Structures are given as C-alpha cells and as structure tokens.
Swiss-Prot record:
CC per GO annotation: cytosolic large ribosomal subunit
Name of the protein in question: Large ribosomal subunit protein uL30
Signal peptide segment: none
Biological process, per Gene Ontology: translation
Organism the protein comes from: Rubrobacter xylanophilus (strain DSM 9941 / JCM 11954 / NBRC 16129 / PRD-1)
Domain of life of the native organism: Bacteria
Keyword Manganese (UniProt): no
SUPFAM superfamilies: Ribosomal protein L30p/L7e
Name of the gene this protein is made from: rpmD
Quaternary structure note: Part of the 50S ribosomal subunit.
Coiled-coil region: none
Length: 61
C-alpha cells in the first residue's frame, strides 16, 4: 500500500476550529512538520479539508 507524506506549510492561526482539529488529527503541530500516513480514503478526506494548509507527496515503500 502506498503512503503519503503530509507537511504543514501554512499556520492554523486564523483557521476555523474544524480545520485546526483536522491538522492536529493528521499529527501536525507546526509549519514544516511532516508525518507519513497510509493512503486511505479517510486520510485523503482529511487532507482535502485542509489542502490549503498542507502539502502532500507520495512516498514509495
């Protein structure tokens, strides 16, 4: 299964609370913080909600 590297590129200051919680649920705390997640529909949905705050790259296993 492929994996996704999610990196926070913009601050959550001024973002709506739902987006702040989604970024935290992805494991991101600050700008340039990265986490690797399995490529699942649930993770893709979370990324879609905060796509203006994060950058996504595919990672080969």
């Amino acid at each position: 299964m492929s994996q996704l590297r999610v990196t926070q590129v913009r601050s959550t200051i001024g973002a709506i609370e739902k987006h702040k919680r989604t970024v935290r649920a992805l494991g991101l705390r600050r700008i340039r913080d990265s986490r690797v997640h399995r490529d699942t529909p649930q993770i893709r949905g979370m990324i879609a909600k905060v796509r203006h705050l994060v950058r996504v790259e595919e990672v080969e296993d």
